[in-house]
Amino acid sequence: MSAVSQPQAAHAPLEKPASTAILCNTCGNVCKGEVLRVQNKHFHIRCFVCKACGCDLAEGGFFVRQGEHICTRDYQRLYGTRCFSCDCFIEGEVVSALGKTYHPDCFVCAVCRLPFPPGDRVTFNGKDCMCQKCSPPTLVGNSAHVAQGLRSCGGCGLEIKNGQALVALDKHWHLGCFKCKTCGKLLNAEYISKDGLPYCEADYHTKFGIRCDGCEKYITGRVLEAGEKHYHPSCALCVRCGQMFSEGEEMYLQGSSIWHPACRQAARTEDKSKETRTSSESIVSVPASSTSGSPSRVIYAKLGDEILDYRDLAALPKNKAIYNIDRPDMISYSPYISHSAVGDRQSYGEGDQDDRSYKQCRTSSPSSAGSVSLGHYTPTSRSPQHYSRPGSESGRSTPSLSVHSDSRPPSSTYQQAPRHFHVPDTGVKDNIYRKPPIYKQHAARRLDVEDSSFDQDSRKKTTWLLLKGDADTRTNSPDLDSQSLSLSSGADQEPLQRMPGDSLYSRFPYSKPDTLPGPRKDGLDLRNANLAPCGADPDASWGTREYKIYPYDSLIVTNRIRVKLPKDVDRTRLERHLSPEEFQEVFGMSIEEFDRLALWKRNDLKKKALLF
């Protein structure tokens, strides 16, 4: 017993010299007159009281616990041990049996009501304790085997002779034999049985336990089952309203998300209106820009084998399939450079990837500042409906470009580069409402003038070859030499105008790409002007767009709290703003491995990471 019972505190006169003051251990003041001394400590009579009730301890017994003085009644109430038989507090000797405490006089045989003699064997039948005289005698025949079985240990199989026995799983056990079947740990508290064998809680869960699909911890007690998934009742929360599911209530399961049926229907309605608005707004163009040399962008949609331009898309009725696309890919644009005189106006289509498509199609070398990439085009049997002429009011044209290896001098006039691509009507009229259009990124390729042969197989490709470059002020600057656009090999470049024998066409299946050879007269090496491919998947790698890196905490979104994200983040691809190290830590994989997953799997991982 940690507390020490003390006799009545004795009055002690002050026998020390007057020069040495005696201080009260409770109030700290000088003791004068009669004082109490307890374990070499002195107290005023009025200061020596119970810590719990404040009663005077000078006239009665007390207990000391952790330096505090407590009266007998309060100590037993707060820290005392009760007898399992009489339910009174135990003072003095105590008997412990089967995890219970008794007064020595209260631990008696359940039959004869006599205390157990010292050293006598005690028989516990699962309910009462009996002495050796009152225990059932050993019977003959079948009864003898039953009695023998009750006294045999369920673990080692030996007879339980002297000492205590433990009854569990309808068997008697030696105290040291009741162990976990897997790890061998003694089970003196809780245990879980399986097929008549005892297991500790940890091993039982490891072998037979059910994990919660929400918190991934083992489930003990009540379990909520939804399909093949199991949850703690407190872990099964609706992702929309955050409320628990009551017993017997219907549940809508989608991936790892759980919905109330009403909440799921409301979310579907919101998503449908949001997607319809996004699809309809994605084909709207802004007014034309008056900036000279700005990159023009053309909207295309591929429907089967037919290519639709912006005019065809704009002519679609609002109730047709173009407005019912289920989250289409982002409409991408194929920019090219239009050289125009000062004062000319250029219109461009603006989409969701303006900045990204423009950065992708810029060259990675400074040597491309004044270069124009030209390409071979396979002639077709049709002529375009529109082409560019100086002073044209419409400003709409189709490119008619060719590379000539002859040495004809450059013309004194400079024709404007085309500003828009338009696809003429084809002979076959497909039904444009038969299925939703598929938006494609048009690839821009480097062109090589040195190779003039056409590959017959490459004519079947559907990738468009577009004129691109940087819109400088070459048409307006007087410092530019008239031969600045000529080739270094001596073959001057033909002016950008329609030549006799050239064909204009609206579809451009390209052959083998060519590049401009050799360094030019102005000292720029065109062979080093590596053009970034514009036909790559805009979300396939980190390199297609420079995403600003933010910490993971600033990108997390939740359903209950409206989080204000940074302004310049892509809300549909928040994971792209993570650093590679933090991306690995959050998703457990690299960005390349993440991109190879299916779309539903990526969305599922983003939901778990609160980035969706």
Curated annotation (Swiss-Prot):
Molecular function GO labels: actin filament binding; metal ion binding
Gene Ontology biological process terms from the UniProt entry: cytoskeleton organization; lamellipodium assembly; positive regulation of transcription by RNA polymerase II; transcription by RNA polymerase II
Chain coiled-coil ranges: none
Residues that bind Zn(2+) 3: C212, C215, H232, C235
Residue(s) carrying Phosphoserine: S282, S294, S365, S368, S453, S477, S579
Biased segments, Basic and acidic residues type: 269-278
Record's keyword annotation contains Repressor: no
Alphabetized UniProt keyword annotations: Cytoplasm, LIM domain, Metal-binding, Phosphoprotein, Repeat, Zinc
Transmembrane stretches, start-end: none
InterPro entries: AbLIM_anchor (IPR032402), Actin-binding_LIM (IPR051618), Villin_headpiece (IPR003128), Villin_headpiece_dom_sf (IPR036886), Znf_LIM (IPR001781)
Subunit text: Interacts with F-actin and ABRA.
Protein name: Actin-binding LIM protein 2
Biological source species: Rattus norvegicus
Encoding gene (name): Ablim2
